[in-house]
Every structure is written in C-alpha cells, then in structure tokens.
Amino acid sequence: MISRVQKTVSSLYHKSAFNDKEKVRKMKHLEIELKTLLKKDEYDHLKDQFTGVTPVLQKNYYIDTPDFELREKKVAMRIRTFEDWAELTLKVPQSVGNMEYNQKLHLKDAEDYLSKEDIPQGLVLAELAKHGIQSKKWQVLGCLTTLRYEMQTAIGLMALDESQYFDMTDYELELEVENHEQGKQEFQQFLEENQISYQKAPSKLVRFVKSMKNS
C-alpha cells in the first residue's frame, strides 16, 4: 500500500529542517508530538521513504542537579549539539504536549558549558527559577546520540531517529502536529498503511536514565 508520505511526495521538503541554521525552533513554543518505537526492519522500510533527506547527527547531553531536582519536578533539560551550532532546551509538561524553551548557543560555548557542567544565563534559567529551581550546581548525566532524518509531510513534521546510548540502539518515529486529536488519527493511519505496530515510546531522556541505572 502506498503511504501518506509517498502520496504527498510533491509537498515534501527534501532536506532536514536542521540543515538550515535559520530554521532554529522558536525560543518558546508548544511541542505536540506523537511517537512510536520501531523495530529495525520497520525503521529500514521507513528510511526508504525519506528520499533525498540528508540525515543530521545530533548529540543530546542531559542535565540535572546532583539531587535530580528537575526530574523530581518532571521537567527536562538538555544541550543538543550539531555540526557547527548548539541549543539549550528546557521542556515543561503541559496538559497536552510540552512547552519548550530554547536558547541558541555557539558550539564552542556549548562545549565549554558541558565541560564545566554549567548553563548560561537567559531564558532557560529564568524559567527554571519560576519552577523554584535555582541550583548553582549542575550535573551532565551523559550523552545520547541520534541520527535523524526529518521532513515536512502533509500530516506534520516527521522525524525518523536511530539513537545510541550506553550499549543500547533504538529506533523511533516522531510526528510533530498542531492538533493532537487530528494528529493522533492521522499518525495511526500512517502506521497502519505501513504495517507498523504501535509501541509506546517513553521520552529519550526516560530511556536514557533507565539504561543509565542498569549500566
């Protein structure tokens, strides 16, 4: 069966959204994502549909306080690095989706913050303070590396990920949408058309921490 992606190939942008540094996500925006874990053969099948997309390597460094205050308050923070730039992101759960706060960083500055286990002044620290988190000490938990294929489709921004952390490799499909209910229906239809069985996908941070505890 021809998938929704294949049917709408003329409407796709055949390059990763992260290839263009001018397309950095808004400093603050509501992220509504649908996702499923994939088997390796399902991942390979879907990758064939991302024709012309250049994959982007991104490294996610997860950060918390030494006593895991962020995890306790159910917020997540990371520095994500790309080939020549980086960003600091805070995710705060909402009734639907996560509110994201993003600060663009120069790659060298990001590397310095990571080596010193520190974070820069700005939007993210200000938002943390609103949640009662004003730590002077930070801890880099480790790194999860993702090879991402990303493109805009008729049903939303789709990302196909292969992630590695500790001794784990997993595969995941994400769809970022504007409307949760409509997006959920279209995502399910896409999975059915591609004969993919839905597997609940905890966040990358949750998967990372679980493996960290078991390592």
Where does each model-flagged region fall?
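Phosphate-end processing signature that detects enzymes handling 5′-triphosphorylated RNA
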Residues: 13-215
